A protein has these predicted regions:
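Catalytic phosphate/nucleotide-handling subdomain of diverse soluble enzymes
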Residues: 185, 189-253
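Glycine-rich loop(s) and the adjacent beta-strand/alpha-helix scaffold that form part
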Residues: 1-36, 209-222
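Long, amphipathic alpha-helical stalk/connector segments used for oligomerization, subunit docking
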Residues: 228-324
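Predominant activation on well-ordered alpha-helical scaffold segments within soluble catalytic domains
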Residues: 5-12, 167, 198, 213-224, ...
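Mobile, glycine/GP-rich and aromatic-enriched active-site lid/loop segments adjacent to catalytic centers
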Residues: 22-206, 288-404
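Short C-terminal domain-edge/linker segments immediately following a structured domain
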Residues: 9-16, 50-53, 224-230
């Protein structure tokens, strides 16, 4: 996970049930600046080509249809009905084309940018949203009017508010939820009195910004109703518990004070690691064992097992995490939350024995989509006392039928 992970780490630690944590997202982006491509595709009507100047996506559809089935990939029907081909499948075509040696992938901007208005829109799009992309093009002499910029696929992201559905297993709204998916208050987690929204809530993809703040409003109203119903009465936190939490939170700073004079060179210390060292270690671990960008998003049960073992060893080392100031203390806790999130992601990826989202990740030992056994939601719970995970399947209910 490349976000701070705190929305997930706090809940996992508390023993909340989580869902769809294997459903990470990989995004097609302009290379190095990571500017989004959607506005260019939709507004400027640009399109992609391989390094030879060829259309490449369609050549991968037959292979992909073998993997996922015609129900999920039917280019002819998509053309007739304007139903878009899923993002992950388009990613797969891009990844496969590069791995076949016909990269890089280019966004064809030279045609659209001949129109002065569209050229202005193209630049303003990034100057208003992803300034780094516009600056990078200027700094590297890339003019989209005269040169088609390169695209790439991103590292995996774990989030519940964009196109994927990672997050907590929450109660749905009373009016549309099946009985077992509603337990009194909309967006309440499986922990009594704990509510979530946006990234924190699982199984609700495509919320984006507007959906997230709308969900936040729904969640806040439900939490107020919970309080009005008297459910929050009698909650007492003792001074002893408060002091225990303070000690836990400030432990990295205390550890630094004790061992700060034992640095042998640079940041090397035999008695602690700092947040940056831990972050680099976690990134490398997840990238290599849980289907990261450098391995073309490929993993398998053996790799995931090794990853879980290394995460366990890292958890022991996080006991010696040090923070020199409040900023590093923030980074230290972000790292611990990322680590817990990474563990949950790895557990879920191992549990789902299929490749449900080719282009987001691949289970090399189970490369096909398997609706017979895995058209389900995955649900986990980490026991706060033992650290052990319990995994289960939950049914998917199609509340909106095809064609509605």
């Amino acid at each position: 996970p490349w976000s701070s992970g705190s929305a997930y780490g706090l809940m996992i630690e508390a023993g909340a049930k989580m869902t769809q944590m294997e459903n990470r997202i990989v995004l097609a982006r302009f290379k190095d600046g990571f500017g989004p491509v959607g506005a260019y595709f939709l507004h400027l009507k640009t399109y992609t080509q391989n390094g030879l100047g060829e259309e490449f996506e369609s050549k991968w559809w037959p292979q992909l249809q073998e993997m996922v089935g015609k129900e999920y990939l039917d280019p002819e029907l998509s053309h007739k009905t304007h139903r878009p081909i899923p993002t992950c499948l388009r990613n797969h075509a891009m990844i496969s084309e590069v791995n076949a040696g016909r990269g890089p992938i280019h966004m064809v901007t030279m045609e659209a940018f001949q129109d002065p208005h569209l050229e202005e829109v193209g630049w303003e799009n990034f100057l208003g949203m992803t300034i780094s992309q516009a600056v990078l093009w200027a700094a590297t002499d890339v003019d989209p009017k005269h040169e088609n910029p390169e695209l790439t696929t991103s590292e995996p992201y774990v989030m519940g508010s964009h196109a994927t559905g990672s997050g907590a297993w929450c109660s749905g709204p009373e009016d549309v939820s099946p009985p077992e998916y509603f337990w009194g208050y909309n967006r309440m987690m499986t922990i009594e009195g704990l509510f979530g929204a946006g990234d924190a809530v699982g199984g609700t993809p495509h919320a984006f910004s507007s959906g997230s703040f709308t969900e936040g409003r729904l969640s806040a109203k439900a939490a107020c109703r919970y309080i009005d119903d008297g459910k929050g009465e009698g909650i007492v936190v003792s001074d002893k518990r408060i002091n225990e939490l303070k000690e836990k939170i400030y432990k990295p700073m205390e550890h630094y004070k004790i061992y700060r004079n034992e640095v042998v060179a640079g940041d090397v210390n035999p008695n602690y690691i700092n947040p940056r060292q831990g972050l680099d270690r976690l990134q490398k671990l997840m990238d290599e064992y849980c289907g990261g960008a450098t391995v073309s998003y490929m993993t398998n049960e053996k790799l995931l097992s090794i990853g879980l073992k290394k995460l366990k060893v890292m958890e022991e080392d996080l006991e010696k995490l040090a923070a020199s100031d409040f900023h590093e203390l923030l980074r230290a806790w972000e790292l611990m939350h990322r680590h817990r999130t990474a563990e949950c992601v790895t557990q879920h990826t191992m549990f789902r024995k299929e490749t449900r989202w080719p282009g987001y990740y691949y289970r090399g030992d189970a490369m096909k989509l398997d609706d017979e056994n895995w058209h389900v939601l995955t649900v986990s719970r980490r026991d706060p006392d033992t650290g052990e995970y319990t995994m289960e399947k939950a049914p998917v209910y199609h509340l909106v039928k095809d064609g509605e």
